[in-house]
Amino acid sequence: MEITEGQLNQLDQSGFFKMDQVISKKEFQEIRTRMEDITQGRIQYSGMSFQLDGSSKAYDSVPNGGGFQGPSDNYRKIQGWEKDPVFLKYMRHPIFRDLTQKLIGDQVSIYRAMFMNKPPWNGTNLPYHQDGGSGWGLSSYRANQFVTVWTAIDDSQIENGCVQVIPGSHKLGLLSDRGHTITEEQVKEYAPEEKSVYLEAQMGEIFVLHNFLLHKSGINQTNKPRRGFSVCYMDGTITRINNPNHKFPVLSGENAIKITG
């Protein structure tokens, strides 16, 4: 199993491509069970970050994150999944190793591994944004040093707030040096509704995304959760500007973290 030239060409031209589930049904169910174990506090790891969803559905009213805040199905974002052996094994699947080796190189680390959730009848309206820029506080943020792999933990549909993208928008580069959200004027110019594409997926399916691709997501208007698992792989030589000694989890290459348990 390896990434094809056609998939890489699609990533280059459109800024994304879709993949089928890469693990067995049993292994995928283990991931779903482990995710529930962590959100409910049955398994806990020091250093994971938990952010509850807001009540207003507005992005600017989302509460700050922190440590584990008790069993809940209402977590919006949880980071630090590389601490768990089940998720670490998934992140190191040979197909993702092939992807990162072809795009980044031999030394690959994890900028972040996060769970994103839109609870039933809720969820946050996440406006158009790009992943990267000086706001990340990194020693480098060139486009070819990053790639994001997003896995559908549940079916992801228009009704439950699936990701929307503007195909080809990664070729614009960063629309601001800081990155992240864009202005209303930029939305009108670069992301009109008629250009948007909904990335619908069945559970287990995967989207590989260019970090500079404009993307957003809406609220969940169904009675079931819409959960996704997102991993941002990056060049392992990158450090934090304000803390060069900070060690990002190394996924492959020298000093790679080991799977335990």
Language-model region placement:
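Non-heme Fe(II)-dependent double-stranded beta-helix
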Residues: 1-13, 20-128, 134, 252-261
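Double-stranded beta-helix
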Residues: 9, 156-214, 238-240
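Short, surface-exposed loop/helix-turn segments at secondary-structure junctions
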Residues: 56-60, 129-133, 179-195, 244-249
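Short, structured patches in soluble enzyme cores that scaffold and shape functional sites
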Residues: 114, 130-132, 151-155, 167
